[in-house]
Structures are given as structure tokens and as C-alpha cells.
Amino acid sequence: TVTVTIPSSTIPGNYILISRANSNNVVVESNTTNNLGFSLLNVFTPPITDLTVANVMIPDTVMLGYTMDTARWVIANLSAEEARGYTSDGIYLSAGNLFDSTATLIGIKNKNINLQPLRTDTVKLAPLVTGVVEGNYSVFVKTDLLNQLSESDKDNNTGISATPVYVKVKELPLNVNELNTLHTISRYYKLRIPDSLYGSTILVTLKSNDSLTMKNEMFIAGGYVPTPANYDYGYEIPNYGNQQIVMSDVTDSVYYIMVRCVSPNPLVQNITLKAVKLPFAILNVHTNSGGNIGNVTVRIRGSLYRDSMVAKLSNGTTTIYASAVYFTNSTQVFATFPLQGRPLGVY
């Protein structure tokens, strides 16, 4: 059985409904000329109804990146005709009390409706809350979102919650391991920076129990919720499960963190997030080898670097000073070491 929706723009009249078996030719057949079926179909204009939305009921708080538990609203048929067909209700978050272009669509409830005259029906949905910042929001519900039903009045299709919902972001405390799971839904966190740490360097790490096969990404923004297209700091290593971000000279009181998995058909991961204040430190070195027939330039990532810093290699008996140190910022420098004729070994 296949259910199809006849477009509302279809002109009433008599039609032939054509169906075809094995339409994508996946099954090998000896004869494909008998795969078509035909049926006469009469399309008529449905009676005009009038739907309204009332009693939008919502929780008082919801976490960003989690589902709302649970939104409910009442659809009423104010007409003398039966409202019948396939329709969609949309649920929106609005920072004000107006339903306009600034409202964010967070969920759509698709349903078959068969509502008798002057009757009501309660609809519920647990939408995923994304695309907004922290704060209070009015919740709007618009019925027949795609204009699939004929109605006498489309201006009364929207209802608003009596009280707002507060969208919160889960907090990531400094120096605390935050355990969570990561699958197909992005996770969001809020990192508070006290006044005493303004100007510091903060390291945020993401560790996965499946770092070699999963592909994770992390984005951070100061004062607003980041997206993959809009952020202040981004992950370092593509196609890898573990990620880290070094934020130098932090100046915002709140940073928002977005973590997502971009692997196709991913498994549920156990992840650990942690944010720490970095002292002067070397986090990693690229490249980590070089021949003793000339110069080698390496990238050194870390924290609290200065333009006047010195870099050297040492193995306990031999010290090799960098001939040049190229300062990029307080988290990265490039150092060139003259290795011509130097003893082999680990430094």
C-alpha cells in the first residue's frame, strides 16, 4: 500500500491514476510490459473549513540541544464542515510576542486530520531545540503550515503559549570532566570565565571512546551560540574523534561550545569534555623529526607564547638553539633549527 497526497493546486475533475511495479528496475524480470496499473480517480474540491490553535502548553525550561518535554496544543474546527486531509503543524520559538520572520521553526508535526464540525483534537510533539541562544521565548504553533486544507480564515491558524519557555545551555565548569554521549544530535555547553581569568589561555578538550573511527567537530564562540558556519574558534584535526581548542587572551564572560559528530551512520559515543586554564606549555610539535643535513622548521602549539621567546632542542648533552623563531600568536610559533652535522638521536 502506498499513500499519496494530491497537491492542493490540482484542478478538480476526472483523472487516471497510474501505478508501476518495480519502477526502479531493481528486480530482474522476464517481462516488464505488464508492470503498469490504471485506475479512474475523481478529484474534487474539499469543503471549506476553519481551524484554530488554542491552549499551547509547554514546559517552563528546556536545554539547548535536547528535546522539549512535551509541547501540547488544541486544534479546533470552527466550521460546519468536516476537516479532512493531510496537514502539518509547525512549532516556533520567538524572542518577542510577535510571530514574524525572526521566529525559529524547531519542529513540524505531520498528521492525517479527520475533525468533525465544532470538535477539537489535542496534538503533542517533543521538538529538538536548536538554533537559538539562551533566554525566554514565546512558543507559537501554526496549524496547516503548508496550506494543505481549504479554509475560510487563515489568519487564525496561530496560537501562542500563555507563559514563555526558558532555553538553558548546559554548563561546563572549569577543571571538571563532563561526561556525556554524542550521536547524531549536537551537544551545547556554556563556559563561564571569571573576571580573574580575563586574558588567560583556556584549553577545551573533547575525548571520545572511539577516536580513530569517529569524526567529531567542536566550535566555540564568545557570547553567542556557534554554528559550523559562524564561530570564533574551531577544531584542529579533521576526520578525528578527539579534538582540542586553545583560546588565547579570553575576554568574554561566557563562551558557548558546540560539539557534533559528522560520521555517516555513527555509533553512540561516550565523550568527555574539559576546560582548563593553561600555564606556559607546549601542547604539540609538528613536524617531530628532521635530518641532519640542513634546517628543519617545526610548528609549536601551546600557550602564553611571546614574540621574544627562544626555542631550543636538548638531549642532555647537546643543545641546538633555533636560528629563527616566527611568532604567530600566543598559542603558536614556528621555529627553525640548524641540524647540519648534529648528532642523531631524540631531543
Question: What residue spans do the PLM features occupy?
Answer:
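Extracellular/luminal regions of secreted and cell-surface proteins that mediate adhesion/ECM remodeling
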Residues: T1-S196, S211, D252-V254, V262-K277, ...
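A short glycine/threonine-centered beta-strand motif
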Residues: I75-A76, L93, G294-R306
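Beta-strand signatures of extracellular beta-sandwich domains
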Residues: S88-Y92, F140, T205, E217-A221, ...
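Noncatalytic accessory or regulatory domains flanking protease catalytic cores in secreted, cell-surface
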Residues: N110, F219-T272, S330-V346
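A structural motif
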Residues: V141, G290, V296-R301, A311, ...
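Short proline/glycine-enriched turn/loop motifs at strand-loop junctions of beta-rich domains
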Residues: L197, D210-M214, S303-S308
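A short beta-strand element within beta-rich, extracytoplasmic domains
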Residues: S200-N209
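Ser/Thr/Gly-rich low-complexity blocks that favor extended beta-strand/coil architectures
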Residues: G302-Y305, L313-I320
